[in-house]
């Protein structure tokens, strides 16, 4: 009885014991219905870790995580897929093509994210560049995740890809026990990326990577 009331009796201990700060569930049993809502609720520039638990389901969302959302643990309960179908040549709301970056299903702009057990998909098909995940932040760690697409599935942007750019510091991203698939250049960008115990599968007879190594990297 007393153990069950510890979080109530000692608020600081309650925060330590709490398994997640936000729960996302499509059936309404959580704090939010969508990941977009949960990301928006993360405090800006927070030094403490925010935990988001995503319950089983397919979430049809295009998510842009800004640089202000940092130090987040995002993990799944059951099979979770985040999917969208934009592609670079698609006309956006401005009347212009979305471009490669604009085609991303999920954009990670913040630092220090740890992501466990989610599947990220760009379902546009073989229509040219269509990014599933774009990473601009540093200190990102993906564990047991799946990245599905065709051309340009995983965009590890890093410091950028401008001609002649010299960098002294660049984004570092780690992948453990992950699965990545695509057709052409489906892992690309200028970030420093480590893939450990990952399966990388080409679904076409083409190039797997298109690295962009800046001077000074």
How does the language model describe each region?
Residues 1-217:
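Sequence-level preference for short, compositionally simple segments enriched
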């Amino acid at each position: 009885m007393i153990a069950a009331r510890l979080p109530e009796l000692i608020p600081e201990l309650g925060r330590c014991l709490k398994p997640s700060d936000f729960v996302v569930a499509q059936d309404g049993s959580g704090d939010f219905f969508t990941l977009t809502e949960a990301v928006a609720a993360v405090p800006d520039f927070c030094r403490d870790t925010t935990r988001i638990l995503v319950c089983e389901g397919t979430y049809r969302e295009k998510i842009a995580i800004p640089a202000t959302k940092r130090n987040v643990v995002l993990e799944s309960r059951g099979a979770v897929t985040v999917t969208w179908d934009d592609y670079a040549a698609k006309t956006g709301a401005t009347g212009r093509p979305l471009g490669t970056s604009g085609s991303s299903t999920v954009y990670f702009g913040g630092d220090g994210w740890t992501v466990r057990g989610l599947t990220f998909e760009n379902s546009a098909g073989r229509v040219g560049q269509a990014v599933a995940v774009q990473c601009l932040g540093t200190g990102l760690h993906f564990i047991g995740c799946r990245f599905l697409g065709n051309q340009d599935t995983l965009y590890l942007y890093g410091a950028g890809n401008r001609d002649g750019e010299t960098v002294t510091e660049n984004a570092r991203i780690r992948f453990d026990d992950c699965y990545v698939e695509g057709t052409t250049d489906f892992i690309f960008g200028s970030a420093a990326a480590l893939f450990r115990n990952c399966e990388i599968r080409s679904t076409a007879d083409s190039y797997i990577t298109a690295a962009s190594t800046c001077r000074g990297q």
